[in-house]
From Swiss-Prot:
Converts phosphatidylinositol 3,4,5-trisphosphate (PtdIns 3,4,5-P3) to PtdIns 3-P and prevents the transition of PtdIns 3-P to PtdIns 3,5-P2. It is one of the known effectors injected by Salmonella into the host cell and is required for invasion and for an efficient generation and maintenance of Salmonella-containing vacuole (SVC). Alteration of the phosphoinositide composition of the plasma membrane causes membrane ruffling and actin cytoskeleton rearrangements. Pfam families: IpgD. It is an enzyme of class 3 (hydrolase). Keywords: Hydrolase, Secreted, Virulence. This is Inositol phosphate phosphatase SopB. It comes from the Bacteria. Contains the consensus sequence Cys-X(5)-Arg characteristic of Mg-independent phosphatases. It comes from Salmonella blockley. The keyword Secreted applies. GO terms for molecular function: phosphatase activity. It is found in: Secreted.
Amino acid sequence: VLTSMANQMELAKVKADRPATKQEEAAAKALKKNLIELIAARTQQQDGLPAKEAHRFAAVAFRDAQVKQLNNQPWQTIKNTLTHNGHHYTNTQLPAAEMKIGAKDIFPSAYEGKGVCSWDTKNIHHANNLWMSTVSVHEDGKDKTLFCGIRHGVLSPYHEKDPLLRQVGAENKAKEVLTAALFSKPELLNKALAGEAVSLKLVSVGLLTASNIFGKEGTMVEDQMRAWQSLTQPGKMIHLKIRNKDGDLQTVKIKPDVAAFNVGVNELALKLGFGLKASDSYNAEALHQLLGNDLRPEARPGGWVGEWLAQYPDNYEVVNTLARQIKDIWKNNQHHKDGGEPYKLAQRLAMLAHEIDAVPAWNCKSGKDRTGMMDSEIKREHISLHQTHMLSAPGSLPDSGGQKIFQKVLLNSGNLEIQKQNTGGAGNKVMKN
């Protein structure tokens, strides 16, 4: 058995920077199966358990060991650069473990250089796969941020069977996302640490399919929305503990305002229509927060966007165009179809959030596949906007220049490394996009 497993281990190794072959995938699956069987046989022998029970125990033990190994590896900042038409862009993915003011990370339950991978589905203390994602351009001798947001896994610890613990866990994860959002706004964070009660606007864009027909993403979306609702009652002040520059825990006061969306982006949503109605019941309310009660494309934006535009900011035209595009998509239900651009609504919501000085946050179930594609779509469009000073029209395919930007972003956005951090292998398993 051990000789066979050694051969499988050798076959399972991917020996170059390329996708695994079918033979390597089969060897990896066979190795996992044999390891679980070996643990089961040992458990049966030692503890006298029935075969079925021993196998169940072995499968859980194997998964727990996998999670522990992935969580305990170093989680470090990923930084990549790309050049297009003479401009130099930097993509940065900063993990929760490196969100620091002093020597330690800012979270009350410290990460200590480690992380929480997407497979840690019972964790009720930390958000899964929590990163701050930034794209900047080097101009006039300094770096200018084009976009910054927070990405993570679903707020639901969905394998926790106790409903009370699951809800507590979802709220703890939401608090970590809010803490990361505050960290992404240094001026606001400094005010909070100085004792001021600060208002924090967050646009949360879930990318799940809000249905339980295949998988349980419908329940996960409910858990996530419930967590946001519990933390953002009108006028509610919440207290977060943040580790300051001296390494001491300090209580800060924030008034969170969250516009919580969910936009299905995979085939189950966009080809089969699963979860669209449930998602849009959340989206209608969030759009009113963001754009006011009159969602006709020709109407002047209200809500958060209206407040921003009333200041006549430098980015007036970009904000107005994004708002109009979002209302057009909504009116025509374009977000219910792929149309060659599955992320059309989700991407524009995140971009609009950033432009009006709110914090964009987005997530799928794991925080790596759909979340990673969304990350790349946002960065592609921001680099394109910086190059051409024009926003793409919804449903339009990138021209050859846009395609080149996208290829560079896909390879240099940090998403391949995040995939490897969570699974041990780089790549992306998004259902056709």
